[in-house]
């Protein structure tokens, strides 16, 4: 079915986005997703793209899931970015048809447009020390998008199947454009951010500053991960705070486990054919170097 380029009304069919997560990934966005769901919201997160959402936090994808990966809503988000670039109001109905809250990438990269479409939404800006954020991203995202070792590059280029590689490249192109637009850095790339701490930290600071300067104070909660919890979040959203502890999910350690699976599959993809090739070559060399048998007279 062709993707629609029609301008979407701000309040289509009465479906509204009630909460917009404007914080960068790795600032506690999955914990926020889990908390919002506990408070009664239905929350969109990048894990929806990957199909690895759990109520108690994201989980590692299975090899079969990665082999069948098709990219979820990625093309819809790419179209959102293209429409914004072309000056066309994006259509977020694919989001609000099922969800009433959205956090993390890719939705966080479009928080200004989401707020314009849903002006009554509350905005939660999850924040973190920018240098600690850089360390977390460099230990997690950067490996997944192939900005790390050669083995990490193999993850994005030759493991699983072609759709994963296409998704990764689309993510880097479209989401980097959206990020660059927000932080005022035309040509921004996540690969450079992964390899240049000063470049990345400047972008993180610019991102947070733009949110704080744009969103009306009565609609914005600056949520410091590790310091704030249900008390602040529930009061801001006008709901009752649960008695359970605020969740802590998708930590760097958990992300490392996902990365281990990716690297293991990459190693199988590269290592097994290489091992077979070496064995075949060795057999050929042995045969080629064998001495012919001579008859005894």
List each language-model region with its residue ranges.
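The conserved 3'-phosphoadenosine-5'-phosphosulfate
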Residues: 54, 124-137, 141, 152-154, ...
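Alpha-helical transmembrane segments
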Residues: 272-286
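PAPS-dependent sulfotransferase catalytic domain
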Residues: 60, 64-65, 112-196, 239
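Glycine-rich phosphate-binding loop used to anchor ATP phosphates in small-molecule kinases
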Residues: 94-113, 118, 126
């Amino acid at each position: 079915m062709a993707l629609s380029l029609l301008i979407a009304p701000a309040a289509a069919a009465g479906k509204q986005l009630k909460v917009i997560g404007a914080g960068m990934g790795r600032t506690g966005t999955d914990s926020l997703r889990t908390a919002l769901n506990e408070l009664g919201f239905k929350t969109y997160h990048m894990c929806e793209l990957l199909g690895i959402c759990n109520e108690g936090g994201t989980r590692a994808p299975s090899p079969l899931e990665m082999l069948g990966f098709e990219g979820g809503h990625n093309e819809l988000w790419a179209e959102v970015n293209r429409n914004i670039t072309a000056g066309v109001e994006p259509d977020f109905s694919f989001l609000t048809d099922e969800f009433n809250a959205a956090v993390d990438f890719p939705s966080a990269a479009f928080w200004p447009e989401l707020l314009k479409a849903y002006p009554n939404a509350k905005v939660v800006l999850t924040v973190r020390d920018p240098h600690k954020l850089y360390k977390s991203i460099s230990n997690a995202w950067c490996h997944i998008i192939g900005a790390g070792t050669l083995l990490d590059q193999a993850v994005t280029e030759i493991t699983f199947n072609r759709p994963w590689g296409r998704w990764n490249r689309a993510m880097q192109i479209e989401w980097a454009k959206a990020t660059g637009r927000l932080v005022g850095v035309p040509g921004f790339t996540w690969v450079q951010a992964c390899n240049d701490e000063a470049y990345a930290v400047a972008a993180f600071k610019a991102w947070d500053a733009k949110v704080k300067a744009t969103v009306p104070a009565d609609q914005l909660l600056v949520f410091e991960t590790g310091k704030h919890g249900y008390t602040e979040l529930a009061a801001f959203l006008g709901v009752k705070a649960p008695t359970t502890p605020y969740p802590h999910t998708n930590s760097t350690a958990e992300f490392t486990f996902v990365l281990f699976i990716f690297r293991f599959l990459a190693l199988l993809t590269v290592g097994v054919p290489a091992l077979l090739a070496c064995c075949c070559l060795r057999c050929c060399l042995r045969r080629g170097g064998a001495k012919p048998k001579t008859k005894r007279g």
